[in-house]
Structure formats: C-alpha cells, structure tokens
Amino acid sequence: MKTNRISGFQWALTIFVFFVVTMALSLILRDFQASVGIKRFVFDITDLAPFIAAIVCIIAFKDKRTQLAGLKFSVDIRVIERILLALILPLVIFMIGMFSFNTFADSFILLQATDLSVSVPTIIIGHILMAFFAEFGFRSYLQNIVENKVNTFFASIIVGLIYSIWAANTTYGMEYAGYHFLYTFMFSIIIGELIRATKGRTIYIALVFHASMSFAQVFLFSEETGDLFSMKVIALSTTLVGIVFIILSLIIRFIVYKTTNRSLDEVEPNNYLDHMNDDDTTTSNETKSEDHEHNDKKDSFTESQLNEDHVELKSQSENQTDSSNEKLKENTSYKEDRRSSVVDDAKDEIDQMKDTSSHKTEK
C-alpha cells in the first residue's frame, strides 16, 4: 500500500511503544480475568491489550492519516477473494490435524468433553470480538506501520515475532512453549500474506481467519489444557499449510508477471520489492524537477535575449530609415535649388534677347 512516509525515529518509537504497552496491559488484564466471570476460551480480556495500545499510539503520535491507512472498511473483489481463502485455509489445517490424530493417536481430544458449558452463539460472539481487538492492533495498525519502512514479507516476519512473544505460553513447559511459538508465528505469517495488497482493507480478512482458527480449536483440540500432542499437531499443520500457501502465492504472482509483461508494482501493488525503489524514485523525481526548472530558466533567458536582439535590430533599422530619409530630403532640396537657378538663368537670357531686339528695331 502507498502512504505518506513517517520519519524513521517515529517508526521505531511507535513499534516500541506499541510492544511495551501491549505487554504491560496483558500482564495487568490477566489478573482481572477471574473477576470478570467469563471463561478464557469464550473471551480472553488480554486481547484488549493490542487494541488499547493501537489507540494510545494513534493519539500519541502525529501523522494520523498514515497511522490509520490500514483500517479501511470498504470491500472489493480482492477482499472477498481473501475472505474465502481465510475460511478455506483453517478448514485445510484442521483436516490435516484430524488426519494426524487418527493416524498417530487413538482419537483427538475434545475440549467439549471437559469444559464446554457455554452456548455456541456465545462462543462465536466472543471469538469474533477477540479476533477484532487483536487484529485491529496487530494487523490493521502495527502491520501498516511496519510496512511503512520495510516490504510486506519482512513486515509480516517482524509482526509475527511480536505477536508470538505477546501470545507466548510457558505454563506447560518449554517444549509446549516452542510449538506454541511456532504456531502463533506461522498463524501471523499466513494473515500477513492474506492481507497483502488489499490497500488497507485488512480487518475483515484477519478477523475471519483468526476467529475461524480459534473457534475450531475450542471444539477439536485440547491444546489450551496443556496437551502437548494437540499443540504439536496444530503447530505443524499450520506451518505446513502456511509454507505451501506462501510458495503458491509467489508462483502465481510470478506467472502473472511473466505472462502479462507488467512490472511487479502493477501485478501486486504491495509486493516484496515495493519499498526498495522509493528512494531512487524520489531522487529521480527531484532530478527531473531540477532539470525542468533549469530548462525553464534557460528558455526564459534565451527568449529575453531574442527580445533584446529584436528590439536592437528594430532600433537600428529605424535609425537607418531615418538617415536614408534625411539623405533623400537633402538630395531633393539640392535638386530643387539647382533647378530654380537654371530657370532664373534662362529667364535672364530671354530678357536680354528681348532688349537687344528692341534696340535694333528703334535704330
């Protein structure tokens, strides 16, 4: 997605503040779970932490438009396509998980057998709310901020690491915690790939995938009760599906790029190389603007020179015309004076001849 860039200092500080506030609020809210009276598998109040952290960062830092660029509620064909994928991928993951249980264990353990004393609609509403609060903070806000400086793939890795640290569960030992970390990391990577190139329309896709995954776990697996085999199956199934999905996505984009002869930016507006050429583009634009200004100055200077030369030539031609007119006047006056003198001489001769003839007549 293309947005106005925030400064590097604000970028790093925003990520740091978001992480610290999220972790601190999670520790604080965890102590209030029992007092609220809602079971954790229905609604975990620690999921409010990333939502509150995002609100705090939006209020505390400038460039509000850039910070909210990842939260758009409009829907287009690409969003619908990704929502369908967000429903299909959890189904594939849990089909692999159930096949693994049937192959490597006697049967999969249902959480319903021990602790499902809440109506299904209540669980659905609770998981939708948890998904919204968590994904608003991590995907619609944090992923958008991280993508402001790095490309989508590495942004998904950074957000995935932060998300996995926030969701870490060390209650049931280190092996369980390791598989849980792998699961949450690949969970986040898949969402990052699903929301790629959606131009900020992320919340629907992330919410559907998150709610589908968490809702199915309540009924099919008992990883939340500390069952290591359940956690291992979920983690490995999610990792397998995530790797295949990312590879297929890369292959499809590469095929589209080759068959249409378009640039990667045209094929995928927010692709892996999206932010790599921004500095070069900025530099080239600045260079072009400077060249344009220089050419404008040069053209204006040339035009002024031409105008000055034209004025000078015009004045010279006018001077030449005036001088030629003066010469013509002088020649004309000279000719008139000469003509008048000749006429006077002729008149004098005629008068003399008349006088001579009159004298002869008298004699």
From Swiss-Prot:
UniProt KW Membrane keyword? yes
Q: Which GO terms describe its cellular component?
A: plasma membrane
Report the subcellular localization.
Answer: Cell membrane; Secreted, Cell wall; Cell septum
Which chain regions cross the lipid bilayer?
9-29, 41-61, 83-103, 118-138, 153-173, 175-195, 202-222, 232-252
Q: Where is this region: Disordered?
A: 269-363
Membrane topology term: Multi-pass membrane protein
The biased composition feature labelled Basic and acidic residues covers 287-315, 324-363
GO MF terms held by the record: endopeptidase activity
Q: Its GO biological process terms? A: CAAX-box protein maturation
- Positions in coiled-coil regions: none
**Keyword set for this entry?**
Cell membrane, Cell wall, Membrane, Secreted, Transmembrane, Transmembrane helix
Which Pfam families does UniProt cross-reference here?
Rce1-like
Q: Identify its protein family.
A: Belongs to the LyrA family.
Q: What does the function comment of this entry state? A: Involved in bacterial cell envelope homeostasis. Regulates peptidoglycan processing, perhaps acting as a scaffold protein.
Name listed for the protein in its UniProt record:
Lysostaphin resistance protein A
Q: Say which species the protein is native to.
A: Staphylococcus haemolyticus (strain JCSC1435)
Lineage, opening ranks: Bacteria, Bacillati, Bacillota, Bacilli, Bacillales
